[in-house]
Amino acid sequence: MSKVCEYYFAPQSPWAYLGHTRFVSLAKQHGVQIDIKPCDLGKVFNVSGGLPLAKRAPQRQAYRLVEMKRWSDHLQVPLNLQPKFFPLPGDPAAKLIIATKLAHGNDAALEVAGAVMRALWAEDKNIGDTDALAAIASACGHD
């Protein structure tokens, strides 16, 4: 029986971005198949008591930036702490990732997910824009 890990994440999450490459690498190293499943953090917040970033106390917002910088440095993953196009809904990016999974499989979807998150958090691109997403998919070799 093969090992499968269901990977729930939000494409616009800085934490998903920071951990994505390491997670995929660890799964491959240990023979674990990843079943990629983008999700809507807004719906998770509504049922779990979490707060969207804009509704958090200023102190928590500031500490979030400190932690993101610390983890970015520790993992040596480039990260723009305040990207031009954040916050934004993750639905368009999630739909691209799901479409890639259905058309080309999990590995292709994992590649596209990494590229989407890198585009937002390291390249200052708008992953809510369909033209930007089409360019990301094309750069990954998908139409």
What are these regions (language model features)?
Residues 11, 17-123:
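Structural alpha/beta surface segment adjacent to cysteine/selenocysteine redox centers
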Residues 138-143:
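Short, intrinsically disordered, charge-balanced linker/junction segments flanking boundaries
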Residues 1-6:
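Extreme N-terminal starter segment of soluble prokaryotic enzymes
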Residues 125-127:
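Helical "substrate-binding/catalytic lid" subdomain
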